[in-house]
Curated annotation (Swiss-Prot):
This is UPF0735 ACT domain-containing protein Amet_0565. It comes from the Bacteria. Belongs to the UPF0735 family. CDD domains: ACT_PheB-BS.
């Protein structure tokens, strides 16, 4: 939970959101990508009213839009195998995120806990894509976003 801009912000999985909020994001994406020119076209394509779009458009953003130029702190659970942390760091480097801090606990029971703080200003992909790529590395058990500034 974060407090900014006169309100409290939450990170919520899209599965928990009402359809009207998801349609708002979809309409905004259509406009952003230039697939439609007007808001009227966008809301018609996604099947929502213009009044609902205007009501929510300033209050919902994909996580990657909120995180551009921010500091993200992640917690990773990795199997204690040679080279896994290196692969994770290589993936971060490929995304052009900047590692600000990294902390690793002593591995116990074959598991290593890692905390990584990233500066996202120069990232060439969004944070969700980076997490998906890191999750595909053999030995990465779990990744959570702990904080964002």
């Amino acid at each position: 939970m974060m407090e900014r801009d006169g309100g409290t912000h939450y990170i919520v999985n899209e599965k928990a959101l009402p359809i009207v909020l998801l349609k708002t994001v979809e309409a905004k994406e259509l406009l952003k990508k230039g697939e439609v020119v007007t808001i009227h076209e966008a809301v018609d394509r996604v099947g929502m009213s213009r009044s609902a779009y205007y009501k929510y458009k300033d209050y919902i953003f994909p996580l990657y839009e909120m995180n551009k130029g921010k500091i993200i702190t992640m917690h990773l659970i990795l199997k204690h195998l040679p080279g896994i942390l290196s692969e994770v760091l290589n993936q971060i480097a490929e995304s052009e995120a900047s590692v600000l801090t990294i902390n690793q606990s002593i591995p116990a029971h074959g598991i290593a806990n890692i905390s990584v703080a990233l500066e996202t200003r120069q990232m060439t992909i969004n944070i969700e894509e980076l997490i998906l790529k890191m999750e595909q590395i053999k030995g990465v058990q779990k990744i959570n976003i702990l904080a964002q500034e």
